[in-house]
Amino acid sequence: MAAYTQFGYGGFPSASQLLPPSVQTTEDASANVNVNVNEALVMTNAPAMSPTGGQDCQGSQPSGGAGGDASSGALSPNALSQNSNAATVVGAGGGSSAGGGGPADLATGGSLDGNGVGTTPTAGGAGGGGSCCENGRPIMTDPVSGQTVCSCQYDSARLALSSYSRLPAASVGVYGTPYPSTDQNPYQSIGVDSSAFYSPLSNPYGLKDTGAGPEMGAWTSAGLQPTTGYYSYDPMSAYGGLLVSNSSYGASYDLAARRKNATRESTATLKAWLNEHKKNPYPTKGEKIMLAIITKMTLTQVSTWFANARRRLKKENKMTWEPKNRTDDDDDALVSDDEKDKEDLEPSKGSQGSVSLAKDETKEEEDAIDEDQKCLGQANILRAGFGYPSAGSGSGGYPGGGGSSSGHPGGYHPYHHQHPAYYQAGQQGGMLPFHGENSKLQTDLGDPKNQLGRDCGVPIPATKPKIWSLADTVGCKTPPPAYMGHQSMPLQQQQQQQQQQQQAQHQYPPSEAGRDQQLFNGAAAPYLRPHTTAYGGFLGATTQQLHTTNNSIPYSNMPPQQQQPQQQQQQLQQGGTIHTTGSSSGPIIPLQFHNRHPQQQQQLQQQSQSTASQRAMGFLEAQPDTPPQTPPNMKVLSGALSLLPTATQVPMTATCRSSNAFGFPASGYPMNFSARLGEYSPRDDYSSGNSSSSSSSSPQLQRNEAMFKPLFKKFTN
C-alpha cells in the first residue's frame, strides 16, 4: 500500500499517515474517508511526513489553550506544512482538553488527509457535532463510525503557495502530469508517470529558505524529481535509471539514430578496413553494418565514404583493384558535404587523373570486346573472317585457303552475320589473288594489320589485335578492318580490277574465260559463298536466292536505277551470272559470255567505271548485324520476283562450282575446290526444300534449268 501510494497511482493515503501514533485503533483507521473535492485546487496526494516525529506535519496546540487557528498562515518548518490545513476540530466530551468546549489536540482527536478534508471523531459526548472547520462545510456523515466529513476551503495565501511549489507534484516520487491538457502531449504512452524511472538527483524547485530547518532539509535531501516536461529526450530510453543525456539517441521521440558528421576518429576505422582490403575495396552489406555500428555512423554515410575513397584512389592513380559494375555500389552520387570540401581542398591531379580514367575506359572496352568474342564463337573463325592470318592460311597469300573448315571465313556459324560490305569487298577482290598479277595487292593481303589504325578512327596497336565489337561495326561510317585493304582506295582498286580482267581475257580464250569465271562464281573466294543455311527455315529460300542472284550483297539501300549498273558490273567481274535482278526491265545476260561483242564488253566496262567513280565518293551505308524481317531487296516489283531462281537450283549451282567438269587441271588454281563438296552439299540440300512459288513458272528459269541438267548428270555419273 505504501509503495503503491508512493508512486502516485492511488489517491488514498496510508493508515499511518492518517492516524497519529497514539491512536492506532482499527476502527478509527478504517473510519477515515478520503473524498476528492474540487480537484482543480486540491491535489490527490498524501501529505509529506515530518522527519522529526513521524506524525503529520501539523502543529499541535496545548490542551486548554485559547480557541482559534493555531497556524494562521505560519510557514515555519515547525508549523504546518505547505499542504496542511488550518482546521480545528471540536473535541468530544471524552477528549483530553481541560475545558469542555476548548479545541481538541490534533494528536488525540482528529486527523487531516491530503485533500484538506478534516475528519472528526464523534465518540459520543456533550459537545459533539460542532463545525469541522472555520471556513469549511460538512459534506456527509459516515454511517459506520458516525464521523462527519467536511471540506475546508483554502485561503488566498496558501492557495498561491500551493500552486507555486506543489502544483506539478505533491510528494516524493509522486508526480502530476506536466502537460496542462492532453492536446499538448503528442505521446500519451510516455506521459504522466514516466518520470518514475529516474533516480532522485536534486530539487529543481529550490525554495529560498531551503536551509531554514529540518523539514526543508528533508525536502531537499529527498529531492523532488523534475517531470518529463523538462527533458528533451525520450524517458523510455532510460530504463533502469540510466540517464542517457548526450547519446545520439536523444532529442527525438522516435528513437532513430541521429546523423552526425564524420570525424577523424570515426573514419580511422574505415581507413584501416580499406587498407586491409585494397585488392577488393567493396565491403559487403554485413561489413558495412558492422562498420556503421563501430563508427556510430549511418549505413548511408559508410557507403558514401567508401565510394568517395575509391574515387579518390582512382584519381590519385593508386587503383589496385579491378573495376566492378555492382548495383549496390552505385552510390557515387551520394557525396556528403564534408567529403566534397575535402576533395576541393586536395590538390588537383588533372593529367594523372585523366590518364588513369582513360586507362579504365580502355580496360572496360577491352572487356566488352572479349565478351563479344566469346558470344560470337571461335576466335580463329572470326580472325580469318576479318582478314587476319589463321591456322589454315594458304601459301598464296590468300587467307583461309588451306581447306580447313576452321580457317574458312565463310564457314557456317548461326550467329555470325558479317557486315554487308564484307561480302561485297570479297567479291570485288575475289578474282585478284586467283590471277596473281598484282604484287601490291599481294603485299596488302599479307599484312592486314597495317589497315587497323585507319578504320573507325580508333587506334589499336598492331601487336595486340582485337576483335571489333558489334557496336563499332554498326556505328562506324567506314567499314571495319575486315577487307584486307581492298576498300581503302576504291577507285584505284577498280582500275586494277579492270586491268586484271583484260589480262585474263588475253590469257585464256574467251570461251574458257567465261566458263572459268562461271565455275568460280562464288567459289573462287570463300567470301562469295552464299549462306544457304544461315537463316534456316526463317528466310531460308528468299535469303538464299538473294545471296545467289545479288552476289553476296544481301542488303542494299541503293535505288533500282543505281543497282542495275552495279549488278552489271558484278556480272562483268564474274563473267557468267545467270541474270540480273536490278529491275524487271533489266537485260537478261545469257551464259554464252564468249559470244558477246568486244564493243559491248567495253560499254559494260565503262558503265562499271562510272559506278566505281560513284562508289569512290563514299562507302555503302553500314547495316545492322541482324537481318530485318523484310530485307530491302524483297521490296522489288513482282516482275523482278519472277526472275529469281528457285532454291532447287542452288545446290546445282553449288555442284557446278565444285566440279572439275571442264577439263581444267586442278593444279592450275590455288586450291582444289572439289574437296569442299562435302562441306557445302549437306547445307545446300537442307535448304533445297524451301522453294519460292513465285518464280517456278518463269520460262527463263526453265531455260536455265535445262542448261544445268547436263552438267549435273555428268558430275553425278
UniProtKB/Swiss-Prot annotation:
GO CC entries: cytoplasm; nucleus
The keyword Transcription regulation appears for this protein: yes
GO terms of biological process kind: cell development; compound eye morphogenesis; dendrite morphogenesis; equator specification; imaginal disc-derived wing morphogenesis; imaginal disc-derived wing vein specification; muscle cell fate commitment; negative regulation of growth
Keyword Ubl conjugation listed: no
Record-given protein name: Homeobox protein araucan
Similarity comment: Belongs to the TALE/IRO homeobox family.
Function: Controls proneural and vein forming genes. Positive transcriptional controller of AC-SC (achaete-scute). May act as an activator that interacts with the transcriptional complex assembled on the AC and SC promoters and participates in transcription initiation.
Lineage: Eukaryota, Metazoa, Ecdysozoa, Arthropoda, Hexapoda
GO MF terms, alphabetically ordered: DNA-binding transcription factor activity, RNA polymerase II-specific; RNA polymerase II cis-regulatory region sequence-specific DNA binding
Gene that produces this protein: ara
Note: 'Araucan' is named after the Araucanian American-Indian tribe, also called Mohawks, who shaved all but a medial stripe of hairs on the head.
Protein's cellular compartments: Nucleus
DNA-binding region(s) from the entry: 255-317
Compositional bias of kind Low complexity: 492-507, 559-589, 599-614, 687-698
Organism (species): Drosophila melanogaster (Fruit fly)
Basic and acidic residues composition-biased segments: 317-327, 337-347
Domain of life: Eukaryota
Keyword set, alphabetical order: Activator, Developmental protein, DNA-binding, Homeobox, Nucleus, Phosphoprotein, Transcription, Transcription regulation
PANTHER family attached to this UniProt entry: HOMEOBOX PROTEIN ARAUCAN-RELATED, IROQUOIS-CLASS HOMEODOMAIN PROTEIN IRX
In-chain residues carrying the UniProt-annotated modification Phosphoserine: 336
InterPro entries: HD, Homeobox_CS, Homeodomain-like_sf, Iroquois_homeo, KN_HD
Residue ranges of the region described as Disordered: 46-80, 94-130, 317-371, 395-418, 478-516, 549-615, 675-717
Start-end of Gly residues biased regions: 94-103, 395-410
SMART domains in alphabetical order: HOX, IRO
